[in-house]
Amino acid sequence: MKHLLIIFISLFSFTVISCSSSSDDGSKSTTTETNISVGSDGYVASAQLSAFDYPEWTVGAFINSSMRNNLLKSVYSYFKDEFDFIFLLQNETASDLGYHGMYIGVSNDVMGISEDKEGFDATKYTGSNGKLKAVIHFPKKTGVQWGPSLHELMHHWGNHSLSTGNLAAYSFDQNVLLPEDELKQINAGSHWGISSVNGQLGGFDLSTLQELGGNWYTADPFGTFANGGNSIPYGNFELYLMGLIPPDNVTDVVLFSGLKATAKEFLDDDKWYAEGKTTVSVEDVINKLGSRVPDYTASQ
């Protein structure tokens, strides 16, 4: 098994105070070259952004492909094209952005983990030549140590497998106001939702699942899209998708469909109604998506 190589880039800026004439309309860009240095321990690089660029990163520059790729190209002007993942870690203790971590895929050639039969490669836009797999941004400096770094890394392999047809993982739209409000069933998307995967991308512990009768179920408290930062290990099915264990070691996954519950029932009482309950084996996944290529003996 090959090892993944990750580089951690800490983003910061010095405050620059300058005087300008009243006729300065701000139309000229003050973007300057990014200065990158490596810490004495050799594990983390620091990128000093300009006083013009850095504020943009505090309000969402990561989702701007131009600004993101310009920064990545600066990284590759300092380093060889050897990294599988680049973690961009904002040197902040608080953030107003609506996420704790965000994964953006750059390339992926793993087969058997999604319905994609060709893979993709957009590395040419980043300064990499086919090596970089993804870039992940953490708005706060605790993102790597406490999470969601393991969660965001898992998005390279999932969830793209339990997402369609009779192998779809479902969840609830929890955007409600009152305890008696009905939760709406939604597709869990790139997370595990109300399923027994029990990993970084959500799901409950199957050993705690109980049938209450009348198609009602309960389990120990769990998250439908995350389960508690880096304190939570990867789930069994997640390890398979990552190429770390063989199919023979994968336990079945329980999925539910036709979900119903009020906000109080699900969020406070940890119970839900389901019209259907499905047990999915790794063989079901392989029949749908094909075998994982490379397998666990040759995966990275």
Q: Over which residues does each language-model region extend?
A:
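Positively charged n-region of N-terminal signal peptides that target proteins for export
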Residues: 1-4
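Bacterial N-terminal signal peptides
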Residues: 6-15
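Bacterial Sec-dependent N-terminal signal peptides
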Residues: 14-36
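Zn2+-dependent metallopeptidase catalytic core
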Residues: 31-149, 153, 271-300
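Surface-exposed patches in mature extracellular/periplasmic domains of secreted proteins
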Residues: 83-89, 160, 252-258
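Structural recognition of the beta-strand scaffold that forms the well-ordered cores
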Residues: 85-89, 155-158, 240-243
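Catalytic Zn2+-binding segment of zinc metalloproteases
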Residues: 150-170
